[in-house]
Swiss-Prot record:
GO terms for molecular function: cholesterol binding; cholesterol transfer activity. Residues 1-63 form a transit peptide. This is Steroidogenic acute regulatory protein, mitochondrial. It is found in: Mitochondrion. Pathway: Steroid metabolism; cholesterol metabolism. Plays a key role in steroid hormone synthesis by enhancing the metabolism of cholesterol into pregnenolone. Mediates the transfer of cholesterol from the outer mitochondrial membrane to the inner mitochondrial membrane where it is cleaved to pregnenolone. The lineage of its organism: Eukaryota, Metazoa, Chordata, Craniata, Vertebrata.
Length: 285
């Protein structure tokens, strides 16, 4: 009965099976062979179970990929590669130079990275749980202009799956208007690794958001924020922000360094005020 049912199903879906490629055909063939073998009363080998599970996992991955266009898959890959690059920079503890240290312990470090340029690293502790920061920085991202004076506006242009988005950010003038208005188009990727949340991004091209008149299109390099519960105090959060920006235009390096370093210090202060004054939503990282 089982064998007959399989043959009937296989016959009715023959045209569909013909359109399958690679692993899909192999999976169908393996299932057919196993059903035939079971009809003869043989035992189920562990090796076959392993192969079906493996093929099923690969097939699931292929089916998930098929939900996205080639361009969307390219954005996903670009975001994940930016995350790996940024985490690799943070992992290397050698060569960091102290830019500033605040009374509350907030610290900005810098380092020159080959093929990237000068990057800045903010290290702070926030007296809020990690979920609250995740909520504000990810789920309420488009509201950042309400509390961060460095940002005029952030818009999510496209969501791709559950981890990847394309954003447009309009930055405010800085350094007494010496640094004019800039905007950024970025691909951002959000992942959780155990108790750690990583929010990463980098500059990208997006046809629906061409360069704006009167605004310089700047670029984020591999950038990320890492959130994790403070060791021994899970209601507090250790935030590490790696900032890499090419502001474009002609600007003295001394001004660029001062602006980026101060931007990180100001961000930490404004974030704390926002978290204290704005009620939390039900968010989980």
């Amino acid at each position: 009965m089982l064998l007959a049912t399989f043959k009937l199903c296989a016959g009715s879906s023959y045209r569909h099976v013909r359109s399958m490629k690679g692993l899909r055909q192999q999976a169908v063939l393996a299932i057919g062979q196993e059903l035939n073998r079971r009809a003869l009363g043989g035992p189920a080998p562990a090796a076959w179970i392993y192969q079906v599970r493996r093929r099923g996992s690969l097939l699931g991955s292929q089916l998930e990929d098929s939900l996205y266009s080639d361009q969307e898959l390219a954005y996903i890959q670009q975001g994940e590669e930016a995350m790996q690059r940024a985490l690799g920079i943070l992992k290397d503890q050698e060569g960091w130079k102290k830019e500033s240290r605040q009374v509350n312990g907030d610290e900005v470090l810098s380092k020159v990275i080959p093929d990237v340029g000068k990057v800045f690293r903010l290290e702070v502790v926030v007296d809020q749980p990690m979920e609250r920061l995740y909520e504000e920085l990810v789920e309420r991202m488009e509201a950042m202009g309400e509390w961060n004076p460095s940002v005029k506006e952030i818009k999510v242009l496209q969501k791709i799956g559950k981890d990847t988005i394309i954003t447009h950010e309009l930055a405010a003038e800085a350094a007494g208007n010496l640094v004019g208005p800039r905007d950024f188009v970025s691909v951002r990727c959000t992942k959780r690794r155990g108790s750690m949340c990583v929010l990463a991004g980098t500059a990208t091209l997006y046809e629906e958001m061409p360069q704006q008149k009167g605004v310089i299109r700047a670029e984020h390099g591999p950038t990320c924020m890492v959130l994790r519960p403070l060791a021994g105090s899970p209601s507090r959060t250790k935030l590490t922000w790696l900032l890499s920006i090419d502001l474009k235009g002609w600007l003295p390096k001394t001004i660029i360094n001062q602006v980026l370093s101060q931007t990180q210090v100001d961000f930490a202060n404004h974030l704390r005020k926002r978290l204290e004054s704005c009620p939390a939503l039900e968010a989980r990282c």
